[in-house]
Amino acid sequence: MKHLGTILFAIIFLSIARSNAADLQVKMLDNSKEGTMAFEPGFIKAGVGDTIIFTPGNKGHNSASMLVPTGAKQWKGEFDKEIRVKLEKEGVYLFACDAHKVMGMVGVIQAGKAVNLAEAKKKVEEENAKIFLNKDRFSKALAQVTKP
């Protein structure tokens, strides 16, 4: 009987934990309030367990990870297709559109604490040298990350 109570508690706890996870949408656009070739929003503060849904607002875009926390899964979406990315590890995730990265079509996700912020800052600095349009977009998005 004691074990049954423990099992029931675990089931209820897991159900509550799952119900707290959110689906957050990011649009892939030619033009947005952020300017040309942009993800909207370009910065997302999420929780571990949340799912980011990248949806095409215009043709010719995808979402691909550039940096993920240790142990997290990389992703590479197909062009013109929705992709769902579940945030299973705490930290900073950097992403871009493969076709428009040099135009500053980049973004940042913070899931929980920014445990890999130093690594993310270094990667953004490296990538900024390759961007010729919307040069400050990556740095502005990363500046919204709250320190661990």
Language model features: what each stretch is:
Residues 1-5:
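Positively charged n-region of N-terminal signal peptides that target proteins for export
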Residues 6-15:
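Bacterial N-terminal signal peptides
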Residues 20-148:
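Extracytoplasmic copper-binding redox domains, predominantly the cupredoxin/blue-copper superfamily
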